[in-house]
From Swiss-Prot:
The encoding gene: IGHV5-10-1
Any single biological process term in GO: immunoglobulin mediated immune response
Residues in the signal sequence: 1-19
Record key words, sorted: Adaptive immunity, Cell membrane, Disulfide bond, Immunity, Immunoglobulin, Immunoglobulin domain, Membrane, Secreted, Signal
Gene3D superfamilies with a match to the protein in the record: Immunoglobulins
Protein name, UniProt field: Immunoglobulin heavy variable 5-10-1
Amino acid sequence: MGSTAILALLLAVLQGVCAEVQLVQSGAEVKKPGESLRISCKGSGYSFTSYWISWVRQMPGKGLEWMGRIDPSDSYTNYSPSFQGHVTISADKSISTAYLQWSSLKASDTAMYYCAR
C-alpha cells in the first residue's frame, strides 16, 4: 500500500474516532422562580470516567461563564465561587451522564447552559 493510501486511511480512521464523541443535553425547559430543575448531559463515544465534565452558562447578550466541573470517576467537584451553593453538579457513571441541578430557581437563572468535556 502506497504512502498516500496509508495517509488517507489514517485520516479516515481519525475522523471516525472524533465524530463518535458526543455530549447530548436534555431539552429546553420553562420553569418558574422557586421551582427545581435538573438538566442532564449524556456522554458517548469515549471513556466517560476519563474526562472532567464542565458546565457553563450564557446569559442573554453575555459571554460564557464557567460554573463548575465534575470528575465522573469519583464525583469530585469544583465550583466557581459565583455558583457555589446555588447549583449542584453530579454524575452517574453507570449511565455516562452528568447533571446540573437547582433546588430553587431564580429569575436571574434564565440563560443557556452547556456541558463540555
